[in-house]
C-alpha cells in the first residue's frame, strides 16, 4: 500500500489532508500510473478537488489541486457520484468539479486554453507533463457558475463522458464530450476546444450544444454507439431518458 501525502504540485503551500478528503470517483489506469480523484466528506473543510497519480511501482507521480489559487480555501471537489475519471487521448485526463464556495469558480471571460488555478463548477482537462506532474490545459465552466454555486447545484454531481469519434461528432466537431449534473442541462462539449468561461455570444457558453433541462443526474450518462448512436441518462427521480443521436438543421448534435 502507498500512503498518499504531500503538497500540490501546482501550489506547494497546499497540503493534502486525508482526514477531510474522500475518494469517490472510479480509478483510471494510464501508462503505468493509477489516478485517483478526491472530493470532500460532506463538505467538511479543509478540502479541495485532487487528482493524485501513483505508479504501479508505488511512487507518487502527481498531486494536482483544483483549488490552487488560494492555499487555505476549500471547494471544487471531484466526486462524480462515483463515476470515474476519463481519458480520451494519450496523456490526458478529464473530470468535473462541484461547488466552489465563493470565489473558486471562473466568473470572468477566460479562454479554455488558459485555465485559471481555481476550477470550481468546471469540466477540466489535465495533461501529463514530462516529469509526470499534471497541468490544466483546457476547461469549460458554465456562464452561470456562481448561480449554481449559490444553490448547491453541482455540475460535478455527474461525471464526464467521451463519445467515440467513429460514431458521434461532426466535421466541425469530431471529438465530443458530454456533461450533466444536478441542474439537468446536457452540455455537448467540443473535446478539442472545451469552451472556457463566458466565451460565447453575449458572455454566454461556447458549446457545441446545450440540451434540456432534463432531470438532475447523480452519476453519468451511458452510451451505445450502435443503431445510429444512443445516450442513456439516469435521472435522480428514478427514470431513464433514452436519446438517439442526430443533427439539427444547422448541423448541431441533438
Positions of the model-derived regions?
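Noncatalytic, solvent-exposed loop/strand surfaces
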Residues: 1-254
Amino acid at each position: 500500500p502507498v500512503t498518499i501525502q504531500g503538497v500540490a504540485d501546482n501550489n506547494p503551500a497546499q497540503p493534502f489532508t486525508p482526514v477531510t478528503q474522500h475518494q469517490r470517483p472510479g480509478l483510471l489506469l494510464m501508462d503505468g500510473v493509477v489516478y485517483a480523484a478526491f472530493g470532500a466528506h460532506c463538505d467538511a473543510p479543509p478540502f479541495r478537488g485532487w487528482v493524485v497519480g501513483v505508479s504501479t511501482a508505488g511512487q507518487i507521480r502527481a498531486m494536482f489541486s483544483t483549488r490552487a489559487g488560494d492555499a487555505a480555501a476549500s471547494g471544487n471537489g471531484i466526486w462524480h457520484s462515483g463515476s470515474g475519471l476519463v481519458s480520451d487521448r494519450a496523456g490526458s485526463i478529464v473530470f468535473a468539479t462541484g461547488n466552489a464556495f465563493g470565489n473558486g469558480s471562473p466568473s470572468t471571460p477566460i479562454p479554455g486554453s488558459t485555465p485559471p488555478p481555481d476550477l470550481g463548477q468546471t469540466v477540466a482537462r489535465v495533461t501529463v507533463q514530462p516529469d509526470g506532474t499534471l497541468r490544466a490545459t483546457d476547461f469549460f465552466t458554465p456562464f452561470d457558475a456562481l448561480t449554481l454555486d449559490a444553490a448547491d447545484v453541482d455540475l460535478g454531481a455527474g461525471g464526464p463522458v467521451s463519445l467515440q469519434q467513429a460514431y458521434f461528432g461532426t466535421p466541425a466537431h469530431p471529438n465530443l464530450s458530454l456533461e450533466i449534473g444536478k441542474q439537468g442541462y446536457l452540455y455537448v462539449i467540443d473535446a478539442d476546444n472545451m469552451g472556457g468561461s463566458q466565451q460565447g455570444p453575449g458572455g454566454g457558453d461556447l458549446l457545441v450544444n446545450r440540451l434540456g433541462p432534463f432531470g438532475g443526474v447523480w452519476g453519468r450518462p451511458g452510451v451505445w454507439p450502435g443503431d445510429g448512436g444512443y445516450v442513456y441518462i439516469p435521472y435522480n427521480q428514478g427514470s431513464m431518458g433514452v436519446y438517439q443521436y442526430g443533427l439539427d438543421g444547422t448541423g448541431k448534435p441533438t
